[in-house]
């Protein structure tokens, strides 16, 4: 009971707003991402090469825009206003996909809107960390709870996405995603705080830290390994819905159920990994995870 009362005091007010926004933005994102390849192939009529090109352009644009926005938000400006702007772009992106079926428009305007919109979630976590630091709260615990909200959103989002897309159409699904982003925007505007900017390290020191890190062989190997692992996972998310429906002839909705189930299993897996990492070691944990991926694929 004491634990529940303590958590209640920690998670009221602004903290509850942070978790609700993370959950709702996660739901909106989970409505769009799992069905995108199906949308491009069936609704837009894009061939496999053009579907892959869309993801490539989207990824490159997302990296460039996210880096630019992160650099700006870390140095100056109100992070909350930036999140609101990203949510506004997310609304525009969802409405564009809801009512447009022209490939060239989607790969240009849609990708640019999505690149800005995708920066909302990392900026939200950064704002939450800054607020937790400024209010002398437990940052690690609060961040973990917020990440759990995101995982929970991916348990619900993919099955809901395929249900809406297959039964009511992609226009309805994207419109609902836009509505969720509008609600998130309102919560951010009226419930989340602005946090005073903390003085940043000098530019010279930052350059030295970045250079020293990249010159470390272990850092480079970790970067390459992470890139390869994320490449495999991204290929799976893109191709799995099409593989289930086209090659296996199974119901399209099964893809959403599989993604949601995987996200649900991910929550206890992350908790167990955090518990056993001190006993097994981070390196052994990573090797085990990669071996599991090899067996899966």
Regions found by a protein language model. Give the residues of each.
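Juxtamembrane intracellular "pre-TM" segments in multi-pass secondary transporters
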Residues: 1-12, 193-225
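Helix-loop boundary and gating motifs at the non-cytosolic
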Residues: 4-59, 220-221, 225, 230-251, ...
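Hydrophobic core of transmembrane alpha-helices in multi-pass small-molecule transporters
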Residues: 23, 103-121, 227-228
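Transmembrane alpha-helical segments of major facilitator superfamily
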Residues: 53-62, 146, 150, 257-266
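Helix-to-loop junctions at the C-terminal end of transmembrane segments
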Residues: 64-78, 165, 269-282
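Structural signature of the two symmetry-related core transmembrane helices
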Residues: 81-96, 178, 284-297
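Cytoplasmic helix-loop-helix junction between adjacent transmembrane helices
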Residues: 111-148
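Symmetry-related core transmembrane helices of the 12-TM Major Facilitator Superfamily/SLC fold
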Residues: 172-190
């Amino acid at each position: 009971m004491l634990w529940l009362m303590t958590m209640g005091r920690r998670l009221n007010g602004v903290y509850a707003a942070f978790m609700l926004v993370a959950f709702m933005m996660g739901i909106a994102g989970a409505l769009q991402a799992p069905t995108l390849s199906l949308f491009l192939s069936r609704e837009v009529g894009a061939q496999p090469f053009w579907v892959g090109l869309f993801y490539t352009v989207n990824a490159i644009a997302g990296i460039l825009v996210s880096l630019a926005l992160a650099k700006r938000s870390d140095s100056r400006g109100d992070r909350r206003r930036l999140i609101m702007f990203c949510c506004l772009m997310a609304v525009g992106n969802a409405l564009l996909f809801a009512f447009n079926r022209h490939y060239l428009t989607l790969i240009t305007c849609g990708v640019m809107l999505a690149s800005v919109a995708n920066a909302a979630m990392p900026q939200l976590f950064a704002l939450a960390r800054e607020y937790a630091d400024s209010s002398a709260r437990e940052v690690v615990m609060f961040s973990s709870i917020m990440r759990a909200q995101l995982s929970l959103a991916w348990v619900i989002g993919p099955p809901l996405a395929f249900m809406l897309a297959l039964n009511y159409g992609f226009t309805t699904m994207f419109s609902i995603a836009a509505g969720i982003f509008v609600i998130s925007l309102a919560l951010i505007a009226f419930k989340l705080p602005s946090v005073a900017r903390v003085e940043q390290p000098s530019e010279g020191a930052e350059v030295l830290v970045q250079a020293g890190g990249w010159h470390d062989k272990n850092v480079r190997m970790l970067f390459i390994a992470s890139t390869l692992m994320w490449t495999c996972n991204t290929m799976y998310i893109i191709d799995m819905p099409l593989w289930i429906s086209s090659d296996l002839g199974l119901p399209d909705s099964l893809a959403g159920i599989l993604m949601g189930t995987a996200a649900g299993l991910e929550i206890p897996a992350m908790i167990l990994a955090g518990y056993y990492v001190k006993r097994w070691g981070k390196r052994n944990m990573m090797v085990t995870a990669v071996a599991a991926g090899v067996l899966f694929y």
